[in-house]
């Protein structure tokens, strides 16, 4: 999980989701997991 100021999709399988007021990215590739800090 990377914590970043700006999250974005890295590949076409990445999905942007809003959870508890935070933007997170989930993907089939675990390296692409991100959360807004």
UniProtKB/Swiss-Prot annotation:
Highest rank taxon of the organism: Eukaryota
GO biological process, one term: translation
Subcellular location: Plastid, Chloroplast
Keywords: Chloroplast, Plastid, Ribonucleoprotein, Ribosomal protein
Alphabetized InterPro entries for the sequence: Ribosomal_bL36, Ribosomal_bL36_sp
Major subcellular site: plastid
Key word Ribonucleoprotein present: yes
Listed Pfam families: Ribosomal_L36
PROSITE patterns recorded: RIBOSOMAL_L36 (PS00828)
Record-level Gene Ontology MF annotations: structural constituent of ribosome
GO cellular component: chloroplast; chloroplast envelope; chloroplast stroma; ribonucleoprotein complex; ribosome
Family, similarity comment: Belongs to the bacterial ribosomal protein bL36 family.
Name the record gives this protein: Large ribosomal subunit protein bL36c
Name of the encoding gene: rpl36
């Amino acid at each position: 999980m990377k914590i970043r100021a700006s999250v974005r999709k890295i590949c076409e399988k990445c999905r942007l989701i809003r959870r508890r007021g935070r933007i997170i990215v989930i993907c089939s590739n675990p390296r692409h997991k991100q959360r807004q800090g």
